[in-house]
């Protein structure tokens, strides 16, 4: 039946886990639906200084981009973002990703 709906709505590969169209909803660390995201490019040896300058970013850490070890991604939900929403790009309905594919997030709005 999954193929019927994906064919009906012209979503090729939505039921195939190896397809980029097979996406899982992104969740915040608290388990809520992530609606904010951003990324920062910082060389590994400067990462500690980055967290000294922006210690609040640790709570939003999501991971590093595969193939780009100096690009760090950060996500948050409506409840966890607090007063830092101006740093992130907002997706009111959230978004989905297939963990088998690399995704680039928008650059963080840090001073």
From Swiss-Prot:
Keyword Lipoprotein tagged: yes
Lipidation (N-myristoyl glycine): 2
Superkingdom as given in the UniProt entry: Viruses
Keywords: Lipoprotein, Myristate
Name the record gives this protein: Uncharacterized protein L672
């Amino acid at each position: 039946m999954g193929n019927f709906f994906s064919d009906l709505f012209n979503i090729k590969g939505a039921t195939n886990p190896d397809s980029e169209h097979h996406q899982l909803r992104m969740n915040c660390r608290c388990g809520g639906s992530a609606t904010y995201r951003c990324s920062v490019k910082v060389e590994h040896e400067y990462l500690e200084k980055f967290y000294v300058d922006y210690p609040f970013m640790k709570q939003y850490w999501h991971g590093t981009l595969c193939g780009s070890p100096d690009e760090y991604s950060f996500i948050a939900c409506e409840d966890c973002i607090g007063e830092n929403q101006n740093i992130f790009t907002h997706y009111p309905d959230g978004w989905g990703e297939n963990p088998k594919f690399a995704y680039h997030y928008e650059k963080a709005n840090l001073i």
